[in-house]
Amino acid sequence: MLHKSPSRKRFASPLHLGCILTLTVLCLIAYYFALPDYLSVGKSSSRGAMDQKSDGTFRLKSIYRHGVGANHRLHQRLEVTPEVISAAGMLYQETTTQGQDFEDQEPLWTTNAEYATTNPFDFEFELRRMPLLMKRMKERDPEFIESYIYGETYMTEEEEHAMWIDDDIVAPNITDRGTVVSLALMSSNAYVRIPQTGDWRNVTEPWNETEPEDFGWDGDGIRGHVFYNEVENIVVLSIKGTSAQGLPGSGEDETTGNDKINDNLLFSCCCARVSYLWTTVCDCYVKSYTCDESCLEKELRRKDRFYSAVVDIYKGVLKEYPDAAIWVTGHSLGGALASLLGRTFGLPAVAFESPGELLPSKRLHLPFPPGLPSYMEGIWHFGHNADPIFMGTCNGASSSCSLVGYAMETACHTGRVCVYDVVNDKGWSVNMFNHRIHKVIDEVLLGYEQAAKCVEPEPCVDCYNWKFIPSRDWESSSRLITKTKSHAAPTTTTRTTATTTSSSTCVGRNWLGFCTKYEL
């Protein structure tokens, strides 16, 4: 008699199911953490696409200089010819020889033998590139962008979302140590003095011959050095701001009123109103820890300020290289301006030791795409934690910055930050002299075997104790004086009392603390 074998139950043991579930969760976690790094260098996973060496080299091709303040209409371009390079090399060697007599003289170039040269303006830079999936505006024409920033272009919420695209672009490989060092050297190149010779061409109106010959070089303007790779059709714009006495690493030890006005306007909470002893750089201060927000925005947008000047320089570069990929870089103030420029036009920007530029980015109403993941941004801030300017701690009445008249009160950066922990690794103490560009290059960027990892900044709020009102008259107009009548028994009396009530209440604030929605 045949017996039917009992069917086996196809059920896994609880231990088996637990192992499968654990492995699945671990795979999902690994995928989640690897996704930003994957997307940050593009959609391709091949090593060749992630890290590509440029076929050509970057050489200095032209220099722009733009006035600020009373000279803000002045804008010139110099083509870097062999004659200019030769004259610059002679001046560099002469300046270097003279600087050897002073122990505290800031070096004009790195002391590293790998990058040694007798003429920084004839140096050829090698940069590695990487693909980057970047979210930026579809329409990036300067005229459209300016109308968008100034609120002259009306669009619905759907139209505003549709104007952002995911764009595959070429960006500098910020994970490559040599590329980071080369970009820092390009930033330092903008500090090296140029002989006041050459065929300067007026970009805007004719140059005023009564202006001093050293305009734009030593104290009263912004300079942009243009490096070009003819093979890859890539431009690197290195930005330098004005010199700053007392702030090391800012080039010449000279200063102007325009320098402090613009620095204090960009990086202070309210017109450099540190205390009653300070002279403010604008008239937006209302009263104790209260500031006119609309006034600040207008001051930053003025044509004689830094931001407008650097936008004009970018327009000149764009006209010169209309089809090229453009990257921007800079150190300190130049790095902050590079970041603002990159934010405005959707350009990859690499900044070194720059002050926090999130606050001026918001005040200028620069484009921030909705729901933007940090790994889809093209802005990187390199710095170390022994630099109080970069870390946002160079403030307060007794700080080094305050003692020389600078209100560096911002600490928050946009994009990603790439911080070297020199305090723990090298035993450095926080000191303003650690801000110097060549100290950063020689002892930090070249002092580590790898470039610092770039991560999303920690949650940060600038000027948390300040109140920013829509306008100077808003606070007084929001209070009403009303008359009320009260009746008492058995006799009826009438009295008039003044009651102060608020006509509106803030029911919604953005993450910077500004009120965005009011309720009556």
UniProtKB/Swiss-Prot annotation:
Which top-level enzyme class is recorded in the Swiss-Prot or TrEMBL entry? hydrolase
GO CC annotation terms, alphabetical:
multivesicular body membrane; vacuolar lumen
Record topology, Lumenal segments:
36-520
State whether it acts alone or in a complex, and with which partners, per the record.
Binds to both phosphatidylinositol (PI) and phosphatidylinositol 3,5-bisphosphate (PIP2).
State the Pfam families in the record: Lipase_3
Give the UniProt family note: Belongs to the AB hydrolase superfamily. Lipase family.
Q: Which SUPFAM superfamilies match?
A: alpha/beta-Hydrolases
Organism name: Saccharomyces cerevisiae (strain YJM789)
What protein does this entry describe? Putative lipase ATG15
Query: Could you state a single Gene Ontology molecular function term?
Result: phospholipase activity
